[in-house]
Amino acid sequence: MPQYRGDMATCGFIEYNDASPEVRAVYDDIMTTRQTDWINNFWKALAHHPPTLRRTWESIKQIMAPGALDPLVKEMIYVAVSATNQCPYCIASHTASARKAGMTDAMYAELMAVVGMANETNRLASGYQVDVDDRFKT
């Protein structure tokens, strides 16, 4: 039986040495792709259901790969959505990634101001049930 650890995680974490070959393969791909020697807790928690682990990793790997948006923009979007969804883990992990990609304290502060304002005005527009202007319709 795998050894689990994690004070907050519902099911605990599956460490590399305790992982099945299927889970280890995903862990190895994560470490290779990210050029790191460790697996963060999010993946260790998802490892309890290997199909979800693999599907989520493959999707994130594709979405976060080089594209029209640069890595900093993608991480800042992740921080914004994570703040709105109130996910402390995601806020912390993606803030660290955004800082690694070049986000400054000033950029973070401005991002949080935009997130706060967007959430407020979204709630106001929803509460007032504002019809979309014809000019904004696509």
Q: Which role does the model predict for each range below?
A:
Residues 1-138:
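Hydrophobic alpha-helical segments
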